Amino acid sequence: MLASTASPFFHEQRAGRNLRGCDLKVCIVGCGAIGANLAETLARMGLPQMRLIDFDRVEPRNLSTQPFLRSDIGQLKARALARLLYRATQCRAEAIAEKLTSENADKLLAGSDLVVDCLDNSASRLAVQTAVRKLSLPCLHVGFSGDGYGEVIWDERYAVPDDSHIADPCDYPFTRPLMHLLVGVAAETVVRFLLNGERLNWTVTLSDLKILPLPFR
């Protein structure tokens, strides 16, 4: 039987992608351009719970790439995002407004069924990688660079990049299109893992993407 069109997850139920019954806890580390949009996408696809880790606060410049509102400026990102997700879909997100470091990573990530690293610096990414390997947790790394390149890679194949000479990704002029493309790929990858344990790795380069028009008849 098809799902009722009254359901807020009608499309996901038809596609076999509904996550409402999923009892696995996804932990998203970093609630910036990638993490905040990925959390919103997963919540709108039906994920009923997640953990959000970020110590930063919403700034005016975040509004162009992140799902926050003007009224959220000055608020802690993790808490503002948790409220947004609950209002939108009743997703219950545990907000942890702490900076993840090598000293507290084990404690913050423990109890997760999947860790998604959406951080923007190598030191924190390394702390996540060290912790998930110690705790034997599956981990997906998602990120992009200032030259229009992005990747969605499982930890087994991931090498933490040296960001000492890398430009701020948000300085890339097409940050929002690339970010949304990358979030879509990451969301599909997370869902495939949650539903059947599949692990796929991807690289995304916006300049190589081909969108071809259909021929007129």
Q: Which stretches of residues belong to each language-model region?
A:
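N-terminal charged helix/coil linker that caps or initiates catalytic domains
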Residues: 1-27, 143
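Glycine-rich phosphate-binding loop and adjoining beta1-alpha1-beta2 segment
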Residues: 47-88
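A short helix->loop->beta-strand "cap" motif at the edges of active sites that frequently abuts
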Residues: 48, 91, 135-137
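S-adenosyl-L-methionine
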Residues: 88-103
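Core catalytic loop region at the nicotinamide-binding pocket of NAD(P)H-dependent oxidoreductases
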Residues: 196-208
